[in-house]
Amino acid sequence: MPTTFHEIPRERPLTPLLDSANTPDELRRLAEADLETLADELRQYLLYSVGQSGGHFGAGLGVIELTIALHYVFDTPDDRLVWDVGHQAYPHKILTGRRERMGSLRQKDGLAAFPRRSESEYDTFGVGHSSTSISAALGMAIAARLKGEKRKSVAVIGDGALTAGMAFEALNHATDVGANMLVILNDNDMSISKNVGGLSNYLAKIISSRTYASMREGSKKILSRLPGAWEIARKVEEHAKGMLVPGTLFEELGWNYVGPIDGHDLPTLLATLRNMRDLDGPQFLHVVTKKGKGFAPAEADPIGYHAITKLEPVTPSAVPRKPSGPKYSNVFGQWLCDMAAADQRLVGITPAMKEGSDLVAFAERFPERYFDVAIAEQHAVTLAAGMACDGVKPVVAIYSTFLQRAYDQLIHDVAVQNLDVLFAIDRAGLVGEDGPTHAGSFDISYLRCIPGMLVMTPSDENELRRMLTTGYLFDGPAAVRYPRGSGPNAPLDAGLELLEIGKAIVRRQGKGAALLVFGVQLAEALQVGEALNATVVDMRFVKPLDEALLRELAGSHELLVTIEENAVMGGAGSAVSEFLAAQNIIKPLLHLGLPDYYVEHAKPAQMLAECGLDQAGIERAVRERLDQLRA
């Protein structure tokens, strides 16, 4: 069984076996008897490397044995291995030639937090969002068939990701086309129970064997000649298996279900995977793992150890940390509790982001009004629409990048019917080390084009609180988009204050250029305003715009500058351009925002500097444009 560690090593551990297995080809040269020692070394090295870089933690510890077994049994990268989401892919990265670069994980120009096709031939599909692996692996299996190639496609998906409808759509389609593929359910949501032991492992070996498959097909041919005999035999078989394994659903969908087996038992994993590798058609293997396996603190607190920050140096830096305010998600969580206490109609809905969106306190105080729908963004939005139809006031707490998955429901089910649903959109803008798959780069663009939608962008924590109240009481759909991380520590209202809809506020009066800020770049814009004696406006509302103020500013300034942490294309700057054009107002404009490419992972400050959205970048761009206009 795996060795249990109790501390994250600060010094690089000795890993002689791991050092000899830089690639899967080298891994496959090791004796099978050495693999359990390799697993211990890989687990210890993972602890060390994530301690140096920070990153997703518990999921990778839980798939050490499975990762070794997959690369040992399958001929990767010729056999296609697709990881769902990618939180668990760090051991895979270590075993596929990237061990020496793990220290650069999630850093600028370093390894990505998730599998990336551009990073390694072993990363067969880029991921970050959940529940895509089965569809992708199915596509690869069909491509292999069309090209006459004899290779396997393997999808590894977690029990949480399997709750999404997309996963079941793929499961259903795979059996319809008879795909030659293997789906592995990495079930780390339950402990290894009594049925995941010797008997279950033994049964899995039998069921997955070619002998069993041949006998089953032979029996089917013989019994099919007798009226009703095969159907009776099939039901007897399913009943016998059902007493020991929970795979009836997958069998009914047409998959050959095997398991559950202990995902930390390497001999059983190897034997079962070898058997299933040699079977044709859609195969489904259920493995049970423990998140955080082999690291005692993570086993005890898998949620807390889902991801960790890098270890602090033993001798702390003498440079004091800059004080900051509460996280925007914490401000939302407190507002939600305050508004729920004031209005019994309020309900909170989240697609599996209870901790990330800070609904923990709300769920504890108002459990009957809290709904975690799991990874089901489409359902979350239409559920909210149904509630709103009958007088309930839903607040959907969702990350910007995940709301993209429910865009049709947002328009068709909420906006077209003008329903009172508030979208609290967390992680808007750049998100740092998680990279482009998790960035909220497009929400202003895809929200502002929806008729009747109220769209707001706070500049600080108190503005967020006021906008949430304003959106909640708005007659129709409303969205407040706010970033990851902490605010500037603005004083918070004690009560629930409203904003005048569509009303911006001039934060600094100047001349020459007017900086129109949509969001949290207000502090940087004010610094630029001081340097250039420019006007600075906290726009607050993307939709509706403060049209009267825009007319006034266009008439009194040389240049209008829009600043937003959203794609420039179709963003708030575009809204200003469209308004001025409709009013036949010709005015020089400068749009600052996210460029027309995916900004790669780095520290947030590095990403903002790359995009010209830090104080220096904004000032430089405005000076250059003013110089051009005045030349």
Curated annotation (Swiss-Prot):
Supply the PROSITE patterns for this chain. Answer: TRANSKETOLASE_2
SMART domains per UniProt: Transket_pyr (SM00861)
Pfam entry (one)? Transket_pyr
Where does the signal peptide begin and end?
Answer: none
Which BP terms from GO are recorded?
1-deoxy-D-xylulose 5-phosphate biosynthetic process; isopentenyl diphosphate biosynthetic process, methylerythritol 4-phosphate pathway; terpenoid biosynthetic process; thiamine biosynthetic process
Q: Which family does it belong to?
A: Belongs to the transketolase family. DXPS subfamily.
Coiled-coil positions are none
- The annotated region (Disordered) lies at 1-21
Q: What does this protein do?
A: Catalyzes the acyloin condensation reaction between C atoms 2 and 3 of pyruvate and glyceraldehyde 3-phosphate to yield 1-deoxy-D-xylulose-5-phosphate (DXP).
Q: Which CDD domains match?
A: TPP_DXS, TPP_PYR_DXS_TK_like
Q: What is this protein called?
A: 1-deoxy-D-xylulose-5-phosphate synthase
| Gene from which the chain derives | dxs
Q: Name one GO cellular component term.
A: cytosol
Q: Which reaction does it catalyse?
A: D-glyceraldehyde 3-phosphate + pyruvate + H(+) = 1-deoxy-D-xylulose 5-phosphate + CO2
